[in-house]
């Protein structure tokens, strides 16, 4: 068949064989280099391409492929393998290539009709058949909610989207790689394999945050089956790296809505008129939810995300909260660090968590009232620890409390009004942190630099100044 000829031709295609260039400061093992070579050969080389267009001429060098990969993920583009690049390569992900020229098809494809069929060919032993059925149906509904598309299930015969579970070589000349690594792949709209969606049955699929959530993986893959490429937006469902998200309240991100509606247009049954957008760090109107330092690194929280700002970094890195801590909620209210204890505290609603480094401490979350707050208190707006006094200020609405970290009790005489003790910063605080004898209070798009010793505002800055804007 023509597919067999194509696959035979691919066996003679270029394969990475030159050594992978590496950063001199990185301590990489031979296994790391082998992983990187395999990753680039699989996801950034046309020789890995099971279907579509062959590109035998002007095959890019390994250094160029590394640069492409680093650029796609927003890393520092060096063309050399380093720890940050390797960390991305080690994360579980979709098996579809990231860059268009290496993708299954050379141009945008879409289904020529809005009424599509799907069939679940077989099942994973990890879940009951009803759990798989529900996850697949819900994953397709993510896309039909925002488009005119309709999906009808077939029990027999050939459907537009054939859903199956398989291991290693599973019939499409694009084998899976065992546990972790590549979780699934899907083919864009078209005949034969077009639309078909395959899941690696060496993975442990689940309906929660254990293993890999089938709904999350399937919703991503169906994006490919409908014609979408990977997105560079880390908040997008079509970002190639797997991140668990709460499925009960899942709303398709705006980036994905925009992409799918370019292909099929909007629908008229969207239950979520507002779709979450990825924050822009240099937005002049940017406000933040929380800020803290963690072992010298600033962590600035906004919606589902946080920015990492390290003294040695030239730019802020945007990361999903769930990609670091699947156990945490999608949004935080407040955060602060107690450096002497090597602990950071994160707050949401009436609960709070403690971090030692990046690890959540056992026996957390705990309740706010365990710190002495009244049980009627619903949330903390901001928190900041003053290392000179050993006190932590907790801000809520127009008031604040003082907490003695040594005694682990609230100080008497509180709460007090923010406007009386910190005049000029406004009647509420969104976030706060301390640095070099100053408290920094964030209120909407502004931050106020407040001298602890003179007890006055010394500078007013834009909130995005903390993100090097």
Swiss-Prot record:
PTM entry text: The proenzyme is activated by removal of the propeptide; this cleavage can be effected by other matrix metalloproteinases and may involve several cleavage steps. Cleavage can also be autocatalytic, after partial maturation by another protease or after treatment with 4-aminophenylmercuric acetate (APMA) (in vitro).
Residues reported in the UniProt entry to bind Zn(2+) 1: 170, 172, 185, 198
Record keywords: Calcium, Collagen degradation, Disulfide bond, Extracellular matrix, Glycoprotein, Hydrolase, Metal-binding, Metalloprotease, Protease, Repeat, Secreted, Signal, Zinc, Zymogen
Binding site for Ca(2+) 5: 291, 335, 383
UniProt-annotated glycosylation sites, renumbered to this chain: 115, 150
InterPro entries recorded: Hemopexin-like_dom (IPR000585), Hemopexin-like_dom_sf (IPR036375), Hemopexin-like_repeat (IPR018487), Hemopexin_CS (IPR018486), M10A_MMP (IPR033739), MetalloPept_cat_dom_sf (IPR024079), Pept_M10_metallopeptidase (IPR001818), Pept_M10A (IPR021190)
Cofactor detail note: Can bind about 5 Ca(2+) ions per subunit.
Chain spans, region Interaction with collagen: 266-469
Motif Cysteine switch per record, residues: 92-99
Residues spanning the signal sequence: 1-17
GO CC terms: extracellular matrix; extracellular space
Function comment: Plays a role in the degradation of extracellular matrix proteins including fibrillar collagen, fibronectin, TNC and ACAN. Cleaves several types of triple helical collagen. May also function by activating or degrading key regulatory proteins. Plays a role in wound healing, tissue remodeling, cartilage degradation, bone development, bone mineralization and ossification.
Note: The Xenopus genome contains two genes coding for very similar enzymes: MMP-13 and MMP-13A.
The protein, known as: Collagenase 3
Organism for this UniProt entry: Xenopus laevis
């Amino acid at each position: 068949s023509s597919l067999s000829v194509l696959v035979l031709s691919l066996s003679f295609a270029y394969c990475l064989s030159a050594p992978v260039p590496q950063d001199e400061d990185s301590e990489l093992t031979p296994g790391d280099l082998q992983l990187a070579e395999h990753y680039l050969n699989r996801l950034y080389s046309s020789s890995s391409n099971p279907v579509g267009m062959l590109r035998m001429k002007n095959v890019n060098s390994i250094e160029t492929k590394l640069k492409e990969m680093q650029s796609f993920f927003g890393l520092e583009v060096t063309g050399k393998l380093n720890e940050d690049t390797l960390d991305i390569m080690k994360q579980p992900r979709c098996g579809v290539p990231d860059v268009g020229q290496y993708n299954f098809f050379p141009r945008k494809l879409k289904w020529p009709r809005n009424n599509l069929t799907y069939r679940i060919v077989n099942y994973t032993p990890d879940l009951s058949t009803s759990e798989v059925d529900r996850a697949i149906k819900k994953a397709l509904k993510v896309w039909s909610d925002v488009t005119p598309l309709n999906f009808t299930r077939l029990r027999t015969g050939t459907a537009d989207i054939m859903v199956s579970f398989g291991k290693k070589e599973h019939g499409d000349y694009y084998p899976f790689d065992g546990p972790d690594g590549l979780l699934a792949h899907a083919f864009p709209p078209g005949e034969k394999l077009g639309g078909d969606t395959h899941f690696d049955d060496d993975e442990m699929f689940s309906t929660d945050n254990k293993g890999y959530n089938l709904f999350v993986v399937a919703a991503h893959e169906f994006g490919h089956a409908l014609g979408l490429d990977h997105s560079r937006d880390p908040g997008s469902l079509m970002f190639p790296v797997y991140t668990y998200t709460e499925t009960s309240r899942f709303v398709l991100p705006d980036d994905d809505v925009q992409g799918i509606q370019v292909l099929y247009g909007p629908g008229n049954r969207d239950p979520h008129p507002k779709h979450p957008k990825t924050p822009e760090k240099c937005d002049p109107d940017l406000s933040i939810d929380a800020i803290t330092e963690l072992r010298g690194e600033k962590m600035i929280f906004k919606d589902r995300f946080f920015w990492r700002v390290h003294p040695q970094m030239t730019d802020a890195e945007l990361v999903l909260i769930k990609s670091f801590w699947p156990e945490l909620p999608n949004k935080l209210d407040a955060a602060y660090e107690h450096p002497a204890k090597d602990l950071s505290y994160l707050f949401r609603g009436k609960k709070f968590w403690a971090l030692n480094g990046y690890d959540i401490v056992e026996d957390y979350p705990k309740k706010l009232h365990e710190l002495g707050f009244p049980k009627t208190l619903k949330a903390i707006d901001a928190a900041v620890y003053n290392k000179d006094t050993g006190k932590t200020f907790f801000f809520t609405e127009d008031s604040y409390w003082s907490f003695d970290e040594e005694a682990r009790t609230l100080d008497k005489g509180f709460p007090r009004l923010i406007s009386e003790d910190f005049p000029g910063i406004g009647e509420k605080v969104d976030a706060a942190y301390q640095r070099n004898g100053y408290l920094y209070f964030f209120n909407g798009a502004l931050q106020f630099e407040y001298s602890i010793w003179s007890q006055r505002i010394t500078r007013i800055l834009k909130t995005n100044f903390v993100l090097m804007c």
